[in-house]
């Protein structure tokens, strides 16, 4: 095997019928974790149901159905390999909670793959005011996914098939609006593909002889190639934030006989080690970490991306809960927020939102009602320039700077400092009505319990 490949995460976005499932299914199918037996089983079922033409998407539909029913399917199924990377598809839209997942997402996407359909009338429908293409691309950019690849799909459906003119027309149009959102188009690869027939997916297609390939220019190195898989291979690897202060949002807290209290969560930034003194915000509890485990193995250190359980002394299960955040007591420990100011983009709210609105916010693992205390200004989504001071209300499509107050103690951070703790989804009426990125936080100074174990550990030092 040699050296382990780097793991990267991608999110696949685009309008409902653009062929996301087929394209993604094709990659997983050809380069991925699905074994031949499963594929043959799927194909047989698809044929029996008269869905022969649907095999790649069918693979994905089967996986999605299992995922939605809460069957934890083997995550390997959502992975595929390129020459350089192990790629995990962290979510594909169409999934009910896609937007929420993308924000509170267990992991940040390193790159978004935008699929647009080239078929007659299809591209126009996807990019129209109420199509999802713009919304998804805007979301990806707002949430800090700065690398983008565009797959111009269904090239077999253009008139004439594999039309260069149609590809160029779409490329021009998409470039113009992703540029408005904030993407640098020089660094975006455009690839004409057929997710169904496989053109330019893994091998250059003889049907697009006019296509000379994609080129990207960026300060971290230029790249070029002919296919979608090569474009994925040219993604810049993420820098994992080990040099930042520790932030570990708790997913659960267990009581384990003979061991004690074991909080579980994913290290978002920094490093967690046994022997460390940790503070849990917003409760300001401080104690010592006795041990750290991942997949039932003891670790000497846990790094960003690791899902771990760690044993803490002198703290009962009742004192900790999901949504609390653990940090290093000696290095920028996390604190509860009195209030915070965020840029909020309203996606789909049926009415007007005004001061006093109190929906539930999902931020990292926290799920807490927060009050829109003061809508300070409306702003242009792209430039961030103020368009109206102290507006009475905001509605779908608006972006605004808002001061929010949590109704219960809550730990959040500025997006600039700790991205995973600085983006949130606003949930109301069982849907995501808005998304936000936190600009600044007013912290509370809370005096909390310091356990005996922590005091002892401090004396030793």
Curated annotation (Swiss-Prot):
It comes from the Eukaryota. Keywords: Cytoplasm, Elongation factor, GTP-binding, Nucleotide-binding, Phosphoprotein, Protein biosynthesis. The modification 5-glutamyl glycerylphosphorylethanolamine is found at residues 301, 374. Residues 194-196 are annotated as: G5. CDD domains: EF1_alpha, EF1_alpha_II, EF1_alpha_III. The keyword GTP-binding applies. GO terms for molecular function: GTP binding; GTPase activity; translation elongation factor activity. Residues 91-94 are annotated as: G3. One of its GO terms (cellular component) is cytoplasm. It is found in: Cytoplasm. Residues 14-21 are annotated as: G1. Residues 70-74 are annotated as: G2. Residues 153-156 are annotated as: G4. Residues 5-242 form the tr-type G domain. The keyword DNA damage does not apply. Its main location: cytoplasm. GTP binds at residues 14-21, 91-95, 153-156. Belongs to the TRAFAC class translation factor GTPase superfamily. Classic translation factor GTPase family. EF-Tu/EF-1A subfamily. This protein promotes the GTP-dependent binding of aminoacyl-tRNA to the A-site of ribosomes during protein biosynthesis. This is Elongation factor 1-alpha. It comes from Apis mellifera (Honeybee).
